[in-house]
């Protein structure tokens, strides 16, 4: 079974799936779905569309240069069947796949390394720009603490609530949420 790659987005095209376009010079273009075929006909550049693998590789979001990627290259030269060779090839394929996955994980971790610091800096800027958000949060925390102190004073018997009462409260919350959503839709 031969699995082709989509000419536009580079995703796999399995037998019996996708569309094949054959140009006058007998060049074959295989597409995984109509979306890719339509974009190809519109002469769009796959490197500019964020959902294609070409974009991800061009933008540095996926590994481009790695020795494990060379093993998946297509080889058209037929080789005489040899049982030992097939067995070794299958074992090597598994090892190469494991190595590739490890390297991809390491590449992703390396790429995401600075995100925490950047997010923290963004949050800091947001708080500096809108200090009222912190005040609102402080008020909420005080209310929660006061409510917690009031609950401690009550008996444990009063704290126990039957399952029926809890389910009724949940239904009321859902109804309130649905009403607020419908109001938002009416406003928009």
From Swiss-Prot:
GO terms for biological process: ribosomal large subunit biogenesis. The keyword rRNA-binding does not apply. InterPro entries: L24e/L24_sf, Ribosomal_eL24, Ribosomal_eL24-rel_N, Ribosomal_eL24_CS, TRASH_dom. Residues 140-188 are annotated as: Disordered. Residues 147-169 have a biased composition (Acidic residues). Involved in the biogenesis of the 60S ribosomal subunit. Ensures the docking of YALI0_B00990g/NOG1 to pre-60S particles. Activates and recruits ATPase AFG2 to cytoplasmic pre-60S ribosomal particles. This is Ribosome biogenesis protein RLP24. It comes from Yarrowia lipolytica (strain CLIB 122 / E 150) (Yeast).
């Amino acid at each position: 079974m031969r699995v082709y790659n989509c000419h536009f987005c580079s995703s796999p095209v399995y037998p019996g799936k996708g569309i094949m376009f054959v140009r006058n010079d007998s060049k074959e273009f295989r597409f995984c779905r109509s979306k890719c075929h339509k974009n190809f006909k519109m002469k769009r550049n796959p490197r500019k569309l964020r959902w294609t693998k070409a974009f991800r590789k061009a933008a540095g979001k996926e590994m481009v240069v790695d020795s494990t990627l060379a093993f998946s290259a297509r080889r058209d030269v037929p080789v005489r069947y040899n049982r030992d060779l097939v067995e070794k090839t299958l074992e090597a394929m598994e090892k190469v796949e494991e190595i590739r996955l490890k390297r991809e994980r390491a590449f992703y971790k390396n790429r995401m390394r600075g995100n925490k610091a950047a997010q923290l800096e963004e949050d800091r800027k947001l708080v500096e720009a809108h200090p009222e958000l912190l005040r609102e949060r402080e008020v909420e925390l005080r209310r929660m603490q006061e409510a917690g102190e009031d609950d401690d004073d009550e008996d444990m018997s009063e704290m126990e609530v039957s399952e029926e009462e809890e389910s009724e409260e949940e239904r009321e919350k859902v109804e309130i949420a649905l009403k607020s959503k419908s109001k938002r839709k009416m406003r928009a």
